[in-house]
Amino acid sequence: MAEDSVTILIVEDDDAYPSFGSLPASHAQYGFRLLRSIFLIMLVIWTAVWLKLLRDALL
């Protein structure tokens, strides 16, 4: 019955960000932070613009 057994391998990794090619994971981490920051800034800007347009339309 050994061929029916299942082995589960758990790998503990402190750095949850993947590495791309030869770049270390820290570079990927900063890239993700940068993209997330840009996305959040754009989200705030678009929200402010839409609120202004909505306010102007209702007044």
UniProtKB/Swiss-Prot annotation:
Write out the GO cellular component annotations. Answer: host cell membrane; membrane
Topology with respect to the bilayer: Single-pass membrane protein
Pfam families in the cross-refs? UL2
Q: Where are the transmembrane segments?
A: 32-54
Q: Which compartments does it reside in?
A: Host membrane
User: What family does this chain come from, according to its entry?
Assistant: Belongs to the HHV-5 UL2 protein family.
Q: What is this protein called?
A: Uncharacterized protein UL2
Classification lineage:
Viruses, Duplodnaviria, Heunggongvirae, Peploviricota, Herviviricetes
